[in-house]
Amino acid sequence: ENENLGDEILEDFETYWEDVNDRLMVSRMVSDSVIKGIVSAVEQEAAERLVTKDMELANLKEYLQFHEGGLSKTELESFGSLMSQNELESMDFRKCMTLSDVFMEHGKMGEFLDGLRSLAKDEFKKLKKSIDELRGSNSVSNKISRSEMAKLEGILQEKESGIWVQLDKTLDNIRMMVDTVFKRMDVMLQLSKTSLHHWQEEHLIKVELESMVMQCVIRTVQEEFEYKLWDQYAQLCGDRNEKLNAISSLRTELDAVLKSLSSSENGHVTSHGSHDADFFTRKKSSEYVTSTKSVWDGNGKLEDSKTDIPENFDAVTLKHMSKDEMVTYFNNIMTKMKRHHESILQKKTDEYFVLRAEYLNLRGGSVVPHKKDKGESDILRKKIPEIIFKLDDILVENEKHPAFTQETLSFGNLKDRLDNLLSENHQLRDLVKEKKNEVKSLLSQVSDATEKRLQHSLAEAGMLKQIGELNLAMEESLIGGSVREDVYTCFLRDLSGGARNEVEELNLGFNMINESNDTSAGSTRKIEIEDLEMECLIMQEICGVISGEGIKEAKDMLKELYLEHLNEKEIRTSLDTKLIEMENKLKFEVEEKDRLMQMEKLVNEKEKLATDASAALAKERVQSEQVRQELNAAKEFASQQQTLASGCNKEVNVIKGQLAEAVERIEVLKEEVAQLNISLEEKTEELKEANHRANMVLAISEERQTLLSSLESKEIALRKQVEKIIGNINESSKMIADFECRVTGRLKTNNARFEHSFSQMDCLVKKANLLRRTTLLYQQRLEKRCSDLKLAEAEVDLLGDEVDTLLSLVEKIYIALDHYSPVLQHYPGDYGDS
C-alpha cells in the first residue's frame, strides 16, 4: 500500500508538471500571436501617422519660410492638413503685409502650437491609460491562476516587469523628444517676436525722422513766407504814407491854384466893384467853410455809420455772412455814402455858381469882355473843389485810422509771442516724446516680465504634472501592494487547505497502517512537517521582503515629493519677489503717466494761448482787409486824376495779389495747424492706450496672485493627501504585523501538532528518501523547464527590441488590446477550469 501511495504521488506530480508545460506552451503561442497582431496593427498606424506627421512638418517648414521671405497662395493651400478651411480662408497672406497682420499671424501660430501641445499631451495620457489597463489585465490574469502557479509567478512577473519598464522608458523618451520640439518651436516664435518688435521700432524711428524733417521744412518755409509778408507789408505801409503826403501836397497846390484864379478874376473888376469882390470872396469863403463843414458832417455821419453798422450787424447778420459777403456788403455801403457826398457837393457848387451868376448879372458891364475866361474859369472852379473835397475825404479817413501806421509794431509783437509759444510747444513735444520712449521701454520690460512669468507658470505646470504622475505612481504601488496581499492570502489559504487535506490523508493512512508500520509512519510524518515548516518560513521571508520593498518605495516617493515641494516653495518665493518688483515698476509707471497728463494739460494751455494768438492775428487780418478796402476806395477816388490813377491802380493791384497770396498761405498754415492738432490728439489717444495697457498688466498681476493663492491651496490639499497616504502605509504595516503574529501563532499550533505526529511517523523515512530522489529528478526537470523559459524570455526580448523600434508610434495600443482582449481573457479561464 505504501508503494502504491508513492506511485500515485509521483504520477500526480508528473501530470501536474505536464499540465504546467502544456499551459506554458499554449500561453507562449497565444502571446506570440497577440504580439504579432499588435505589432502589425501598430506598424500600419505608425506608417499612417508618420505620413501625416511628415506632411505637417513640411507644411510648418513652408509656413516658416513664408515668414522669412513670403509665400504664394498655392503654397498656402498645402497647409490645409493642419488647419480648417475657415482658418485658411481667413488667413489671406500677401507679400506686402502690414504690421498688425504680421502680429495677428504670429499670435495664430502661438495658439496653433498650444493646441498641438495639448493634443500631444492628451494622446500621451490616453497611451499611458491603455498601458496601465493592459498591465492591470495581465496582473488580474496572473491573479486568477491557480495556487500551483505561485512559484512560477515570480519569474513571469519579472519578465513582464522588464517589458513594461522598457515600454515606460520609450514612452518617456518620446515625450522628451516632443517636449524638446515644442520648446524649440517656442524659442523660434520668441525670436520671430523679438525681430518683429525690432522692425516695429525701426519703422517708428523712420516715421519720426520723416515727420521731424517735414516739420523742419515746413517751419523754414513758413518763416520765409512770414518774413516776406512782413517786408511787403512794411513796404506797403511806406508807400501808402508817401502817397498820402503826395495827396496832401496836391491839395495845397490845388488850393493855391483856386486862390490864384479868384485873385485874377478880382483883378479884372473895376475899382468901384472892389467891395463886391470882397463880398464875393467872403461869401465864397463862408460857403467853402459851410461846404467843408457839410463835408465834415457827412464824414462824421459816415464815420458814425461805419461805427454804427458793425455794432448793429455784429450780432444779427455778420455772424451768418462769409468773408466775401461781408466785403461786398461794406463796399456797397461805402459806394452809397460816397455818391451821397458827391451829390451834396454838386448841389453846393451849383448854388455857388448861381449866386455868382446873379452877382455878375447885377454888375452886367464887366462880364462882356471876359466871357471866354469866365467859361474856362467856371470849368476849373467846378473841377477843383470836387478834387479838393475828395482829397480832404482821403486825409480825413487817414486821420480816422491812426493805428494803421502802428500795425507793424503790433504784428511784430504778435510774431515774437508766436515764436515764443512755438518754441515752448516744441520743448513740450520733445518732453512728451521722451516720456513716450520711457513708457515704451517700461512696456517692453513689462512684456519681458510677463514672458518670464509665463515661463515660470509653465514650469509650475510641469511640476504639477510631475506631482500628478507621482500620485498616480503611489496609487499604482498601493494597488500593487493590495493585489500582492490578496495573492499571498489566496496562496496561504491554498497552502493551509492543501496541508489540511494532506494531514487528513495522512491520518487516514496512519489509521490504515497504524498497526503494521508505527515507526515508519512517524518518520515520514516528521519529514513532511519539516517540509511544511520550510515552506512557511519561505513564505514569511517573501512577505517580509515584499513589505520592506513597498515601505522603501513609499519612503523614496515621500522624499522626492518633499524635495519637489521645497523646490516649488523656492520658485514661489522668487515669483513673489518678482511680483513685488513688477508692482513697484507699475506704480512708477503710473506716476510717470500722471506727470505726462500734467504735461498734456500744459500743452493744451499752450495750445489755447496759440489759438488766442491766432484769433488776434485773425482780428489783425480783418483790420488789414478793412485797410485794403480803404485802399481800394482811395484808388477809386484817385482814378479820377490822370497822373496818380494809373500808378495807384497798378500798385494796389499788386498789393491786392500779394494779400490774396498771403491769405492763401495763411489758410495753408491753418490746415497745417489743424494737422498738428490732429497729430496731438492721436498722441493723446496713444497715451490713453498706454494707460489701458498698464491697467491690463495690473489686472494680469492680480490674476497671477489669485493663481498663486490657488496653488497654495492645492499644495495644502496635496500635503493632506500625502499625510493620508502615510497614515494608510502605517495602517498597512500594522496589518502586516498583525498578520505575521497570526501566522506565527498558527504555525506554533501546527508545529505542536506536527511534533505530536512526528513521534508516530518514523517508519516513513525510507519512503521520504525515495521521494527526495524523485524531487531531485523533478528539480532537474524544473531546471530544464527554466532553461526553456529563459529561451522564451530571450525570444520575448527580441520581440521587445522589435517593439522598441516602433515605440515612437505606440499611441494606438489600446485599440489592439481591445481587439485581442477576448483571447487574453479566454485562455486563463480555460486553464482555471481544467
Curated annotation (Swiss-Prot):
One of the record's GO cellular component terms: Golgi apparatus
Key word Membrane present: no
Origin superkingdom: Eukaryota
Coiled-coil ranges from the UniProt annotation: 410-456, 574-700, 792-812
Tissue-wise expression: Expressed in seedlings, leaves and fruits.
Localization annotation: Golgi apparatus; Cytoplasm
Keywords: Coiled coil, Cytoplasm, Golgi apparatus
PANTHER family attached to this UniProt entry: WPP DOMAIN-ASSOCIATED PROTEIN (PTHR33883), WPP DOMAIN-ASSOCIATED PROTEIN-LIKE (PTHR33883:SF9)
Oligomer status and interactors: Interacts with MAF1.
Name of the protein in its database record: WPP domain-associated protein
Organism of this sequence: Solanum lycopersicum (Tomato)
Species lineage: Eukaryota, Viridiplantae, Streptophyta, Embryophyta, Tracheophyta
